[in-house]
Regions:
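Extracellular/periplasmic carbohydrate-active domains that bind, remodel
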Residues: 15, 19-473
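Bacterial N-terminal signal peptides that target proteins for export
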Residues: 1-11
Length: 473
């Protein structure tokens, strides 16, 4: 066939269509393949099982009057059950006051539906000090309200209620802010012997065994913390009024958090903060918090880099978020990195919810954040941005030598009804610390301002509408 101009045009057009088709096919295949990784992760997360014996705390002297301190009775029941090979510690109907509860391997704490556990607000009830992390920094501090260290096969289940009783008159005032009850002359974590001292220990890499906080240091304990544990189940209970972070799995793996209701609007009341954890499922939970609803972390600054353990292989699905600084969050204590995160089918909305999807770090904290996949998120109202990536979080910390890298982030099928920004990204000048961000098939309505994207590398928007206008690039 003679190669005239018409034939050449037809051939070029045919090749172009073929290339577009192949590219689209590869994109679909690639997206499908990425989410297959989530199925693989899910297959590795297995809920723990427990021996059949049941140990009622009433048989160990617990009193359900809401006034008697039951710390010894509850922990005696746990010790007895552990020495008997494990089983279920039953919290029956009634109101029980307690201090720190320390779980042991092969123990399930089960709350009957009308059971309520009140936690003392006396700091002395959380001594002796235990090894922990506080805001991503290693130390010895007050025991978390419920704590486990180096355990396997542990659980808290049942439709009862855990109440930390924190408020402006006790733990929250330690923040050092008037909004949470602090007054001039009162001690707080801002004292030289508090948070600033721990920050100094971190920077100077003082041995952890010398970092003794606790009394007169005013660092609030988290509600639930499991440190270097395996095979964890948290299911069905309501948890409220935490002193600090609410659920804090730390350096742990094979974790299931399912059907939990978090109602805790105090300062730093993050809902669920897996830190340097692997293989995590957070499913069907409700979060109404005073800080981030779910925040993935991996240590702060030099401590995080010393461990160098990312949070990885996390699935979040079918959750609802109400109040909070962010719905799905990565950071800011993220020095060990974060990867292979899959979030889908969540709903979030509140005038007191600042952002829906949030990544936050800076050049002091650093961290590589990569392979993040988020889809099918329904957002009603947020007060700031639907999607925010901030590599200059807390600029008062100054510039550091550990620039972060946020890359390979895939966000699709997001709808929102009201926000100041649809997308807000802030990188670092002269650095490409935000790159390969893909936002597709999203519709943002009721947006007040243009998207703000500064100091970022490749950001691709495909089939994205803001206030009804297509903004593909």
């Amino acid at each position: 066939m003679p190669m005239n101009r018409s034939n050449v045009s037809i051939i070029i057009a045919t090749i172009s269509v073929y290339i577009v088709f192949c590219c689209n096919a590869r994109t679909v295949e690639s997206t499908h393949t990425k989410w297959e990784k989530a199925d693989s992760i899910l297959s590795e997360i297995v809920e723990p099982s427990f021996p059949s014996p049941v140990f009622n705390i009433m048989d160990f002297g617990a009193v359900a009057d809401g006034k008697t301190l039951n710390t010894i009775a509850i922990n005696n029941a746990i010790t007895y059950a552990s020495e008997s090979g494990g089983g279920t510690i039953l919290i029956p109907g009634g109101t029980f006051l307690t201090g720190a509860i320390h779980l042991k391997s092969n123990i399930r704490l089960h709350l009957e539906e009308n059971a309520s556990v009140l936690f003392s607000v006396n700091p002395e009830d959380y001594l002796p000090l235990v090894i922990t992390r506080w805001e991503g920094m290693d130390c010895y501090n007050y025991s978390p309200l419920i704590y486990g260290y180096n355990l396997e096969n542990i659980a808290i289940t049942g439709k009862g209620r855990l109440n930390g009783q924190a408020d402006h008159t006790n733990w929250w005032a330690w923040k050092g802010q008037r909004a949470y009850g602090w007054q001039t002359g009162m001690p707080s974590q801002l004292n030289a012997e508090g948070r600033p001292l721990l920050m100094k220990y971190n920077t100077e890499q003082i041995p952890v065994e010398q970092r003794l906080m606790g009394e007169e240091h005013y660092l609030r304990p988290p509600f639930i913390q499991f440190y270097q544990c395996k095979n964890i189940l948290l299911q069905d209970f309501t948890i409220e009024n935490a002193p600090f972070w609410v659920i804090h799995p730390l350096l742990s793996e094979n974790i299931t958090v399912k059907g939990i209701r978090v109602n805790s609007n105090g300062t730093n009341n993050d809902g669920c903060d897996p830190e340097s954890c692997k293989n995590v499922l957070i499913e069907g939970c409700f979060f109404n918090t005073g800080d981030d609803c779910i925040a993935l972390k991996s240590g702060r600054n030099d401590d995080g880099r010393r461990w160098n353990i990312p949070t990885e292989n996390v699935i979040v699905r079918n959750c609802k978020m109400q109040n909070g600084h962010g719905g799905i969050v990565i950071g800011s204590e993220i020095s060990g990195g974060c990867r292979n995160i899959f979030v889908e089918n969540c709903e979030m909305s509140s005038p007191e919810l600042d952002r829906a999807i949030r990544i936050k770090t800076n050049s002091q904290r650093g961290g590589i954040i990569e392979h993040i996949h988020i889809r099918n998120i329904r957002v009603g109202e947020v007060s700031e941005a639907v999607i925010k990536i901030d590599c200059q979080y807390e600029p008062q910390e100054g510039h550091g030598n550990y620039p972060p890298l946020v890359k390979n982030v895939h966000i699709s099928d997001i709808t929102s009804r009201k926000a100041k920004y649809a997308v807000f990204m802030l990188g670092i000048k002269n650095l490409v610390c935000i790159n390969d961000i893909f936002i597709s098939n999203c519709e943002f309505s009721g947006v007040e301002r243009e998207s703000n994207i500064q100091e970022a590398g490749r950001v691709v928007m495909d089939k994205v509408k803001i206030n009804g206008t297509l903004v593909n690039n």
